[in-house]
Amino acid sequence: MIYPDEAMLYAPVEWHDCSEGFEDIRYEKSTDGIAKITINRPQVRNAFRPLTVKEMIQALADARYDDNIGVIILTGAGDKAFCSGGDQKVRGDYGGYKDDSGVHHLNVLDFQRQIRTCPKPVVAMVAGYSIGGGHVLHMMCDLTIAADNAIFGQTGPKVGSFDGGWGASYMARIVGQKKAREIWFLCRQYDAKQALDMGLVNTVVPLADLEKETVRWCREMLQNSPMALRCLKAALNADCDGQAGLQELAGNATMLFYMTEEGQEGRNAFNQKRQPDFSKFKRNP
C-alpha cells in the first residue's frame, strides 16, 4: 500500500464488519489492509471470559491467514477500558475461568502466544483502563498507542493471582527489574505519561485522536516490506524466546494457585467488594 502524501495517512478508514458469529468481540477489516479486534464487554470494563478469548483467537487466526491484511489492531469497546483482565465473576475453584459448560480455562495464555507468533504486527490501541491480564495483553502486542486517559497496572496479588510468565519476565525486560517489582508487588496504577516514561507504550495521544493516530501508524507499516517486518518480529522475539517455556510453567503454577484457599480469598474479596484478608496465610521462609 502506497500513501503518496502525509495527509493520506490520516484519511478516514472504511471498516467492514466481519463479526458474524461472535458474541464477545467485534471484528472488522479495512479496505487498505488493517484488521481490528475489539473486546466488546464494556459493562465489565472489557474483562475477558473464556468465550472472549476463544473469539479473539479465532479472529487473530483469520487476520493472520488473510493475505489482504498486513497489520492487526487490538482494542476495547468504548473509552473507559482497553481490558481489565480476567472476569473474576467466572473464575472458578479448579484452576481457571469457567465457560458456560463449567470447564475451566486459562486460554488467555494461548492468545498471548498467538500474538507473539503472528508474523504480522499487532498494535494495542488503549483507552482507559489496561489492568491485570489486560495490561499483559497490551504488553504482548508489538506496539502500544495510548490515549491520554489510559491507566496501566497489575492487580494480581490483590485478587489472589499472578502472571509469572511473560507478565513478569517480559515486563522486566521492558521497564527493568526494579520497576517491574514495584508494579507487581504494590499493584499501583500509572497514567499514560508515566507509562510512556517507563517504555510501556510507544506514544500518547489525545483520546479524540486515538484511532486516527493508530491507523496512521498501521498505514506507515503497510508501506514497508512484509517479509522484512515478519523477520524483524521473529528476531526481536528471539531475544526473549526462553520466556515461552517460563510462560508454560508459570501458567500451570497459576492454575494450581487458583485452587488454594489463599488464591480464592483474593477472588472472593474482589467479587464481594471488600479488602482481602491474607493475614491468615503463613509467610513461609
Curated annotation (Swiss-Prot):
Its cofactor is hydrogencarbonate. This is 1,4-dihydroxy-2-naphthoyl-CoA synthase. It comes from Escherichia coli (strain K12). Changing residue 156 to D: Loss of DHNA-CoA synthase activity. SUPFAM superfamilies: ClpP/crotonase. Its EC number is 4.1.3.36. It is an enzyme of class 4 (lyase). Changing residue 97 to F: Loss of DHNA-CoA synthase activity. Converts o-succinylbenzoyl-CoA (OSB-CoA) to 1,4-dihydroxy-2-naphthoyl-CoA (DHNA-CoA). Hydrogencarbonate binds at residues 154-156. The lineage of its organism: Bacteria, Pseudomonadati, Pseudomonadota, Gammaproteobacteria, Enterobacterales. Substrate binds at residues 45, 84-89, 97, 129-133, 155, 161, 258, 273. Homohexamer. Dimer of a homotrimer. Inhibited by sulfite and nitrate. It catalyses: 2-succinylbenzoyl-CoA + H(+) = 1,4-dihydroxy-2-naphthoyl-CoA + H2O. The hydrogencarbonate anion plays the same catalytic role (proton acceptor) as the side-chain carboxylate group of the essential 'Asp-185' found in actinobacteria, archaea, bacteroidetes, and deltaproteobacteria. The record marks 97, 258 as: Important for catalysis. InterPro entries: ClpP/crotonase-like_dom_sf, DHNA-CoA_synthase_MenB, Enoyl-CoA_hyd/isom_CS, Enoyl-CoA_hydra/iso, Enoyl-CoA_hydra_C. One of its GO terms (cellular component) is cytosol. Gene3D superfamilies: 2-enoyl-CoA Hydratase, Chain A, domain 1, Lyase 2-enoyl-coa Hydratase, Chain A, domain 2. Belongs to the enoyl-CoA hydratase/isomerase family. MenB subfamily. The gene is menB.
